[in-house]
Design a protein with these regions (language model features):
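Cofactor-binding beta-sheet edge motifs in enzyme active sites
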Residues: 2-738
Length: 738
């Protein structure tokens, strides 16, 4: 590992024992009331690290664990730099604080909507708003430097404390598996923590030396696995408080909705019912058990009235077609299309994508308690400070009177960026004056899911005489999902800068720019006004823009009479990492050119600083596609933990398979038709194909991995089905025509 030098400019050294180190935001307010706190027998080493008298190394993690392995990857970075024994490492969620803001998530979740705002200004926004976000595959990329500095600083302090006792130069000491060592002398970290906390950090600070690096890139076991296996891991619905009631809720369609009828008498006849709570937009039943609450809710048989247009399939398609027929907003371009797409010889294709649901195993849930003028929530959330603000508004409280405890999440895929359940739980706790446990039913979670929106696209291109593309035009009809998210989630002072007033929405068409070397291209966003709630889904807009782009590349390759992999690589002269992923996937998968009857298809993608290529192999059985094999090659830069990366790639492939073959819904009278997993056509264990994942060694900075595998699956599978049927598949989900 290379040796780096870090100055003290970004560090403030505390004066007393245990005061530790804090990041000094010299030009900004320092009213950070909530910071990491040392418990009994613990010594604080800044905002990221504590060492206990029992030898535990406790790493503060600001990101929420929802299966992606962040409770392991981030501590591994600290432990590696510190020279710790992995068996002694523990995790502690951080409190809400500007110290743990994630400005990179502003860029990734909103698809570059804020790119015209200087990066330092974006960073200041995030810090001032304490914008703690888990999403956009940003955790390692955002926090690696801070964590390495924290580990290196604590290591230096331990070395200096040991050197003082041994009366040697501290640079002659090293750390090794939880010990400070100099010759035959050894001290456990626990024996030095108290003295080390009062030492002064050296300037410059050595990083990446003296024992560090022993854990980097190693497949260390997950820290959260034992608790999840034995059932001791707590989720939001596991919290139990004295005098708590269980609540079931049912909401009306989105829009101008009001509750017009509920049979309170029928609900109150259910044994164990405590109260019925009516809200203009929803109704809830509280009871001594969750079963009684659900039975009472069914007895209420609520009816809602909604003014305005209600979402239905015909209306959605009509709105998308009207948007596509109108003039779009140019969001990105190069060269000049001019008359290149006029006249004969133009290749054209139209694509459609149905609304896609998150379909997480754990439904939205929250536990809330109001006492002594303070509201406390245990919540599944990817944005705890935003959830706190939402709950405070709903309860009519100041934000400082609300505490949010982010819990582990049983899958989220972006759904926990929104906080309807937090608002409902806050109102219920305030109304009932006792703790409440609110769990949405499976039907409620699907009906009111903020879906990845339905989208329609028209792709047009022209080939030169030698078969290479000279013109490319993508026209995408989609709602302004990014702006809607910004209005829901971000402070008004930040949200108003989305796209700096541009009529297009960067998030809605994220990933639409081709990675290929094409002289003349343009991407237009056609804003569609749809009466449904949309949100962020794993992979973002890349989940459909990759489908449009890669399927269209296949069609251009066929028109040119060129094999699809060669066609792509010929246009990737400026991206050797993506080209290598393609060639490696083809080699590992036994790619035969995607010829008729092969059942093979291939696609590639750049996302979150990483590159991926996916080859799919499929057959058709009883009129339905059966995926037999998926081969993925990934270049995600320097890897912290290869096992975690493989888990995320494998999970992303299965998630992409679900999005390709199902996980979608139609709409009727403003609500999703889907009510349960049984109608979502999600892959079962028996449907899981053979999966091969190859990680390409790289010294590039770490890229994101939790989403990278998702977008390439659908176009690869569409290519495989084309080779079997001779037909082009231009709609998601993929359905074999009768």
């Amino acid at each position: 590992m290379a040796t780096g030098r870090i100055t003290r400019r970004g560090l403030l050294v505390g004066g007393g024992a245990g005061a530790g180190l804090l990041v000094a935001w010299a030009l900004w307010p320092r009213r950070y009331a909530e910071t990491l706190v040392a418990g009994p027998g613990e010594r604080l080493f800044g905002a990221w690290l504590k060492i206990g008298e029992d030898g535990r190394v406790i790493v503060a993690v600001p990101q929420v664990e929802h299966g992606q392995g962040v409770f392991t990857a981030l501590p591994q970075i600290v432990a590696d730099e510190l020279g710790a024994d992995w068996r002694t490492v523990a995790v502690e969620p951080t409190p809400a604080s500007p110290l743990y803001a994630n400005p990179l998530a502003l860029d990734e979740l909103w698809g570059g909507a804020f790119d015209q705002v200087p990066a330092p200004v974006r960073g200041e926004w995030a810090k001032r708003a304490a914008l703690m976000l888990t999403g956009g595959s940003t955790s390692v990329r955002q926090f690696e430097d801070d964590l390495r500095i924290a580990g290196a600083t604590a290591r230096a302090l331990l070395l200096k404390a040991a050197a003082r006792r041994w009366d040697v130069d501290w640079t002659q000491c090293r750390t090794e598996a939880g010990f400070v060592v100099a010759g035959r002398n050894r001290f456990r970290f626990a024996e030095l923590a108290g003295a080390a906390a009062s030492e002064e950090a050296p300037d410059p600070l050595p990083q990446g030396v003296q024992g560090a690096g022993a854990l980097a890139g190693k497949p260390l076991p997950r820290l959260d696995a034992p608790a999840k296996v034995d059932g001791s891991a707590n989720f939001a619905a596991d919290i139990r408080l004295a005098d708590m009631v269980h609540v079931a809720v049912r909401a009306g369609p989105p829009g101008d909705t009001r509750l017009v009828r509920a049979d309170r008498a029928a609900a109150e006849r259910v044994a164990g019912v405590v109260a019925v709570i009516e809200n203009p937009r929803w109704v809830a039943a509280a009871a001594t058990t969750s079963w009684a609450a659900q039975r009472a809710l069914d007895g209420l048989a609520p009816r809602f009235e909604t003014r305005g247009v209600l979402a239905d399939d015909a209306g959605i398609e009509g709105a998308l077609r009207r948007a596509l027929a109108e003039e779009g907003h140019r969001v990105a371009s190069a060269g000049s299309l001019g008359q290149l797409l006029s006249g004969g010889g133009v290749v054209e294709a139209e694509f459609r994508v149905a609304p896609a649901l998150h379909a997480a195993i754990e439904t939205p849930s929250a536990t809330a308690s109001f006492h002594d003028g303070r509201l406390e929530l245990w919540l599944q959330t990817q944005a705890p400070t935003i959830a706190r603000a939402a709950a405070a508004r709903a309860a009519g409280l100041a934000e400082h009177a609300v505490t949010v405890h982010p819990m582990m999440i049983g899958g989220s895929f972006g759904a926990a960026l929104d906080h309807d359940v937090a608002e409902q739980a806050a109102v219920l706790a305030m109304t009932l004056k006792r703790p409440v446990s609110l769990i949405w039913s499976r039907g409620e979670s699907l009906i009111h899911d903020r879906c990845r929106p339905p989208v329609m696209a028209r792709m047009r291109g022209r080939l030169a005489a030698n078969g290479t593309p000279v013109a490319w035009h993508a026209q995408i009809a989609a709602p302004a999902t990014g702006r809607a998210m910004a209005e829901r989630m971000l402070p008004a002072s930040v949200a108003e800068f989305t796209d700096l007033g541009s009529p297009g929405d960067a998030q809605a068409i994220s990933g639409a720019v081709p990675p290929y070397r094409i002289a003349n291209w343009a991407v237009d966003h056609h804003l569609a006004d749809l009466p449904l709630q949309s949100g962020y889904l794993r992979g973002g807009a890349d989940g459909y823009t990759a489908f449009f782009k890669e399927c269209f590349v296949d069609e251009l390759a066929a028109t040119a009479g060129t094999e699809p992999v060669s066609f792509r690589i010929g246009m990737l002269g400026g991206d050797p990492r993506l080209a290598r992923c393609l060639s490696t996937a083809a080699s590992l998968g036994g790619w035969d050119g995607g010829v008729a009857g092969s059942g093979q298809g291939i696609a590639c993608r750049r996302l979150r600083g990483s590159a991926v290529a996916v080859m799919a192999e499929a057959r058709i059985e009883r009129g339905r596609p059966v995926v037999e094999r998926l081969v993925a090659t990934v270049d995600c830069g320097r890897v912290v933990n290869p096992d975690l990366v493989r888990q995320q790639i494998e999970g992303g492939l299965i998630f992409g398979l679900a999005q390709a073959l199902g996980a979608t819904t139609g709409y009727e009278r403003g609500l999703a038709r889907v009510r349960g997993f049984d109608t979502l056509h999600l892959p079962r264990l028996a449907d899981t194909p053979d999966i091969t994942v190859e990680l390409i060694r790289s010294d590039e900075p770490p890229g994101g991995v939790s989403e990278i595998a998702v977008p390439a699956v659908a176009p690869a599978l569409a290519g495989a089905l084309h080779s079997l049927t001779g037909k082009r598949f231009r709609s998601l989900p993929l359905v074999i025509p009768a």
